[in-house]
């Protein structure tokens, strides 16, 4: 089941490598007020007020290297001796990267966070703030990305990297196709949308085995563990899965051994993750809308389009969707028929409701800049994107490996 990332606007195909080191890929969250949480820097709260504000919640900036967001939160919960569900965040961040983000929590004293703020390897806590506001998913403007691309010797301009300076300057990088990027589906193991489709179809057994079994791009004990799941040898699988990184699979398998109920297994997952499966399937369908619109029409405003900030939008199909009119509506109807969808089925009893919304088909890139390091054959780029948009969608237009 592909990711439906089929079309390009630029397709520069630079032959290079990203993320040779985590610090080659920097993601800095931008708050709703437009403040960039710069790596290694305090926002600038006044020291004398920092712990004197009234409120039930605490917000802080978490800087991490080579941690995924959920594992980092789980480690913070362990160190502070509180429950993981007491923490919240505005958005997940890449693992193999240097990232910053605001995190919220309750039931923890600021002094406890001060104690552990530099005690976890590759995680730093700063800017601790009491507040009355609960930090929720989506409570951010977006992210700033700063990325190094290291040219391979096989690149056509490896011996004259300065040519890319002019090429990048002359390319229009104001707008990009508003695809959901590979992270939405699983960068290393792209099965999230497949699990979501099974859940939409109420096939929780297939969803369970696709998530916990079905090895893809894996080797060693993890591959063996997933094969054990596929064979129904759950106790053997539990002994093989590394406990730190495969926490969710372990919880689901244990719950299945206990209950024999595939659907119930998904209830032991964090709510954000259990929702992510169906959200990923909705994203897969939206990406197909972009493909059809790009291939057969254009992104000019057409009769019947619902327009947001000057851009045409499409439906993220869900239980409350009102279909578009005109050509965009025809595209949506085609996808519904092709996938044999009943939109009301996105309301899944005793699991969750996925009402759908609208999303721009193209999106704006802000403050795109590039520079060349001729001595080391490195191209550095930086840009800002609003929440819900994916840097990989920009990068796939620039670099061949995406």
From Swiss-Prot:
Gene Ontology BP term (one): tRNA pseudouridine synthesis
Catalysed conversion reaction: uridine(13) in tRNA = pseudouridine(13) in tRNA
InterPro entries noted in UniProt: PsdUridine_synth_cat_dom_sf, PsdUridine_synth_TruD, PsdUridine_synth_TruD_CS, PsdUridine_synth_TruD_insert, TruD_catalytic
Main function: Could be responsible for synthesis of pseudouridine from uracil-13 in transfer RNAs.
One GO molecular-function entry: tRNA pseudouridine(13) synthase activity
Source organism of the structure: Methanococcus aeolicus (strain ATCC BAA-1280 / DSM 17508 / OCM 812 / Nankai-3)
Protein name, UniProt field: Probable tRNA pseudouridine synthase D
Protein keywords: Isomerase, tRNA processing
Keyword tRNA processing in record: yes
Name of the gene encoding the protein in the UniProt record: truD
Domain of life assignment: Archaea
PROSITE patterns, per database record: TRUD, UPF0024
Lineage, opening ranks: Archaea, Methanobacteriati, Methanobacteriota, Methanomada group, Methanococci
